[in-house]
Amino acid sequence: ATANKEDETAAEEIKRINKAIYERSDAELNALYDKGRQVSLDYFETIYAMVDTKFDHYFFESEAAPIGKELVLNNPEVFPESDGARVFKGEEYGLHSRVFLNSLGLPTYEAKELALAKLKDEFVHYDHSVVSTAKEINEYFKVLLKAMSFVYHELAAKTEHVGHGM
């Protein structure tokens, strides 16, 4: 769990694997990833059946990632470069800064979340979107919604985050 911080060789290998998975450039990794993803999806279906629910559509990170990356790159005034990464400087708005593209050029959850808002709107043309997550990421969502207000103003205006938990 600490190899990324304690072992430079391991850290480089982790970066290589992450990049290869994102780019789908390694057939062996692709097969492992696809199998693991399918096992997870199948198991989720058993949980959904237990609680008698279903979903009409699934949105995957792999769909959102290239859209988020392009969005960040096309808005350098919102996401300036910092140490090879693209960041949103939240401090300017009383928030904290977040990385949207890492120094390898890979989109982070933040960039994917921006793209997800767009994908969801294109799919269902929503009037209001409620995103419910654990309250531990309330501050993350404040930054995300502020960044969204600059690139997808209309979506930010109709997106609400609700944090829950104990």
Model-identified regions with their sequence ranges:
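NTP-dependent nucleotidyl-transfer catalytic core
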Residues: 1-166
